[in-house]
Amino acid sequence: MIYTITLNPAIDLVIITKKLEPNIVNRTENFELQPNGKGVNVSFILKKMGIENVATGIGGGFTLDYITAGLTEKGISNNFLKVKEPTRINVFTRVLDQNQEY
């Protein structure tokens, strides 16, 4: 059995907007959420290759709940040490009219 360890898991939040302008409210067209972190990503790849594994690590809050739910949904066993502080969220903005991501 392979165990992956993610000491700093994350959720990647990608906000999709047509344009990005300073000093105004920029409305989003859509968004994407994805569990992330080095070990989490390795677990997803191993599963795609048909290799059973257990994702482990340290995290907390509703964000860890989202990450573990995403792993479970893909059939990946997981066992994270839960801490009080929420797991981080990485925010990216994809600007369609510029074909750029920030």
Where are these regions (language model features)?
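Conserved N-terminal subdomain of the carbohydrate kinase-like
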Residues: 48-102
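Glycine-rich phosphate/adenosyl-contacting loop at the front of the ribokinase-like
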Residues: 1-56, 65
